[in-house]
């Protein structure tokens, strides 16, 4: 008989979106204590960049921002956990307590088959997609094969996705329905400033460069869209230099409607 106790590992996830687990809740709690992402990152054992990226993912995942922060490098930049973030921390704690009680009952005499447990753990599966944006459908135009779906992201920002007509029908897409828009960072093109001129990509999100991370070949750019929303692009290092992209510089993210994948909660 296995004497090792069951350990609860609570994870919350909407379909197609990154999970929110105890590690992210601990990060939120640390931000609330320290008032900076850098201090919180040190406490929970993350790099500053990983913690900053996690905050961006959380803010994109929820309707209201969980953290309001200003980039300030590894030693600066204030951060504040919002009321929505505090509510998530409290709610997650209640769920963890309930799960612990349920596990106590499970250990009392019920032995779940290994395959059943594996099925449960699969619910916490992560996605490699870099950009997951919570949106609201504003219009659906159905065609014979494809459907054009218009989405509201934030005040002043909207997206368009082109998916199959069958997918739009099966998902029940209609104005007011909440969805998640998934866009690979490598699909996002960047233009300096707010007017990219004539281009066929119908999705144009203008913001301010919040962070730049250079690699030997590629550069990751995080664009602040306002209202604590952001989008990430991976472009060549040469292109980033040619465009003069640096924190504080305005830029526009461009991507095709066909590169937007939609997922529902």
Swiss-Prot record:
This protein's name: Molybdenum-pterin-binding protein MopA
Keyword Plastid on entry: no
Pfam families, per the entry: HTH_1 (PF00126), TOBE (PF03459)
NCBIfam families found in the cross-reference section: ModE_repress (TIGR00637), Mop (TIGR00638)
Domain Mop intervals: 126-192, 198-264
GO biological process, one term: molybdate ion transport
Similarity comment: family membership: Belongs to the ModE family.
Keywords: Molybdenum, Repeat, Transport
MF (Gene Ontology): DNA-binding transcription factor activity; identical protein binding; molybdenum ion binding
PROSITE patterns according to UniProt: MOP
PANTHER family: DNA-BINDING TRANSCRIPTIONAL DUAL REGULATOR MODE, TRANSCRIPTIONAL REGULATOR MODE
Disulfide bridge positions per record: none
Database matches in Gene3D superfamilies: 2.40.50.100, Winged helix-like DNA-binding domain superfamily/Winged helix DNA-binding domain
SUPFAM superfamilies associated with the record: MOP-like, Winged helix' DNA-binding domain
């Amino acid at each position: 008989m296995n004497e090792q106790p069951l350990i609860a590992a609570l994870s919350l996830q909407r379909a197609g979106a990154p999970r929110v687990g105890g590690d992210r809740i601990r990060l939120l709690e640390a931000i609330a204590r320290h008032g900076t992402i850098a201090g919180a990152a040190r406490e929970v054992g993350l790099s500053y960049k990983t913690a900053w990226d996690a905050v961006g993912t959380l803010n994109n995942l929820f309707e209201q921002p969980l953290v309001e922060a200003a980039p300030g490098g590894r030693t600066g930049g204030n951060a504040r956990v919002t009321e929505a973030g505090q509510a998530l921390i409290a709610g997650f704690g209640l769920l963890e307590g309930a799960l612990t009680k349920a596990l106590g009952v499970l250990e009392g005499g019920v032995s779940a088959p290994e395959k059943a447990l594996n099925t449960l753990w699969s619910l916490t599966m992560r996605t490699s997609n870099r950009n997951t944006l919570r949106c609201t459908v504003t219009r659906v135009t159905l065609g014979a094969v494809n459907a054009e779906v218009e989405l509201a992201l934030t005040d002043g920002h909207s997206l368009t996705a082109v998916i199959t007509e069958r997918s739009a029908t099966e998902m029940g897409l209609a104005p007011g329905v909440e969805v998640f828009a998934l866009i690979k960072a490598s699909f996002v093109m960047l233009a300096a400033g707010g007017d990219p001129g004539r281009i066929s990509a119908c999705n144009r999100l203008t913001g301010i460069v919040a962070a730049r991370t250079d690699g030997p070949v590629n550069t990751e750019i995080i664009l602040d869209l306002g209202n604590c929303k952001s989008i990430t692009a991976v472009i060549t290092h040469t292109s980033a230099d040619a465009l003069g992209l640096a924190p504080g510089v305005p830029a526009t993210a461009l991507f095709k409607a066909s590169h937007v994948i939609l997922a529902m909660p």
